[in-house]
Amino acid sequence: MKQSVSGFVFSGGQSSRFGANKMFHLIDGKPMGLVVYDNLKSAIQADTFFVGPHIDQADFAASPRLVGSREGQGPLGAICDVLETATTDFVVFAPCDTPYFLPEQFRCLAESSSAEGVVVSADANNPHLRHWLLSCWNVASTRDHMISAYEAGERAIHKAVTGLTILDQFFSELQLTNINTPTDAQ
């Protein structure tokens, strides 16, 4: 039986270090948020959504968006919103500021998914550096656990996953780069 997957790009955040909405920063002439969205969608060949506040820019008008009851409550709230509403077996997450994580890396995450738990991107040179927002989650085996942790007051993803099966998938520092300032994209 083929497992179903969907993709979600986190569009929230204040971009305070960036000085402007980083989703709109051009990478090779294309808004960074769309670079990430297109990389993820190309990799999984399935429904892909932005998660977070309304994106008020014409380039994003055709891209579907998910808004949940925890909107504005940080990344863990967004993860719980997706897990709560997902209709697929697996969900793949990406933050909007990781344009160097290419379709082949997203495919690797999705293909590494297991019957339980989470496949999380980790830095090959610093394995303790996990990138929870670049990850693939088994919806059925993680949904209740994560929502319970959130409802108990937890807001840190690395603490909320305690007790879940975690598989590290290693990538290079460049592939995992978060663009937090305009100079990071040069």
What are the residue ranges of the model-derived segments?
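Nucleotide and nucleotide-moiety/phosphate-recognizing core
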Residues: 2-154, 159-175, 182-183
